Amino acid sequence: MKAADVRAMTTDQLDDELANLKKEQFNLRFQKATGQLEKTARVKQIRRDIARIKTIAAEKSAGKKA
């Protein structure tokens, strides 16, 4: 997911996407623990997408306060 795509989302959409990514991260963690994880790079990608969404959400909330 690109930062430009994330910036185009509303705060509600960001919250929904963040919840979906956290669920996927949870599932990937269990797959890794049981040895069923095939796409190991997906863990890193999900982690960075979560960070990207949190960063942009914080920027948007800081922009509203200023």
Swiss-Prot record:
GO terms for cellular component: cytosolic large ribosomal subunit. One of its GO terms (biological process) is translation. Pfam families: Ribosomal_L29 (PF00831). Signal peptide: none annotated. GO terms for molecular function: structural constituent of ribosome. The keyword tRNA-binding does not apply. InterPro entries: Ribosomal_protein_uL29, Ribosomal_uL29, Ribosomal_uL29_CS, Ribosomal_uL29_sf. Keywords: Ribonucleoprotein, Ribosomal protein. Gene3D superfamilies: 1.10.287.310. The keyword Ribonucleoprotein applies. Belongs to the universal ribosomal protein uL29 family. PANTHER family: 60S RIBOSOMAL PROTEIN L35/50S RIBOSOMAL PROTEIN L29 (PTHR10916), LARGE RIBOSOMAL SUBUNIT PROTEIN UL29C (PTHR10916:SF0). This is Large ribosomal subunit protein uL29. The gene is rpmC.
